[in-house]
């Protein structure tokens, strides 16, 4: 809108030579009243009255978890143990939960379907984490299991 106001001020001052430039073209809304142009504004900056920064924190935590997984996978290979097994169980479950949550957000429509999909997602994530913890406690663990698969 700043461009519109500046171009309209050029027209009112009879400086038509500015329109001979290829970079400046006449704008169709110049015939509007200046008061109307000034009152209709588009704001591209963020809303300073937002309720929370939950989306920003969620995005940041997703990226932090992805970076942590990049370090956790070599650590699982070099230093297999219970701490790394349970860390992998938590990180992989949370990473999968957030990823499938985005699929639900993008592709599931309708209030009842969204509630059912989110409930199913929470149940799947809880069962996945419980299963991985059970596997870590009662069997060889994630790190040793992957090493055994690689040794085949």
UniProtKB/Swiss-Prot annotation:
It is a multi-pass membrane protein. GO terms for molecular function: heme binding; metal ion binding; ubiquinone binding. Keywords: Electron transport, Heme, Iron, Membrane, Metal-binding, Mitochondrion, Mitochondrion inner membrane, Transit peptide, Transmembrane, Transmembrane helix, Transport, Tricarboxylic acid cycle. The keyword Heme applies. One of its GO terms (cellular component) is respiratory chain complex II (succinate dehydrogenase). Its main location: mitochondrion. One of its GO terms (biological process) is tricarboxylic acid cycle. A ubiquinone binds at residue 107. Heme b binds at residue 95. The keyword Membrane applies. Pathway: Carbohydrate metabolism; tricarboxylic acid cycle. Residues 22-56, 105-113 are mitochondrial matrix. Component of complex II composed of four subunits: the flavoprotein (FP) SDHA, iron-sulfur protein (IP) SDHB, and a cytochrome b560 composed of SDHC and SDHD. Belongs to the CybS family. Membrane-anchoring subunit of succinate dehydrogenase (SDH) that is involved in complex II of the mitochondrial electron transport chain and is responsible for transferring electrons from succinate to ubiquinone (coenzyme Q). SDH also oxidizes malate to the non-canonical enol form of oxaloacetate, enol-oxaloacetate. Enol-oxaloacetate, which is a potent inhibitor of the succinate dehydrogenase activity, is further isomerized into keto-oxaloacetate. This is Succinate dehydrogenase [ubiquinone] cytochrome b small subunit A, mitochondrial.
């Amino acid at each position: 809108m700043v461009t519109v106001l500046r171009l309209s001020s050029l027209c009112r001052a009879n400086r038509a030579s500015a329109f001979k430039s290829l970079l400046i073209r006449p704008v169709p809304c110049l015939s509007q009243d200046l008061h109307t142009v000034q009152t209709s504004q588009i704001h591209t900056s963020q809303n300073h009255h937002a309720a929370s920064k939950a989306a920003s924190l969620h995005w940041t935590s997703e990226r932090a978890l992805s970076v942590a997984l990049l370090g956790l996978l070599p650590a699982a290979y070099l230093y297999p143990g219970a701490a790394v097994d349970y860390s992998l169980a938590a990180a992989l479950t949370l990473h999968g939960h957030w990823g499938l949550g985005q699929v639900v957000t993008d592709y599931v429509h309708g209030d009842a379907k969204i509630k059912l999909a989110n409930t199913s997602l929470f149940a799947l994530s809880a069962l996945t984490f419980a299963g991985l913890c059970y596997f870590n406690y009662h069997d060889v663990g994630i790190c040793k299991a992957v090493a055994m698969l690689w040794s085949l």
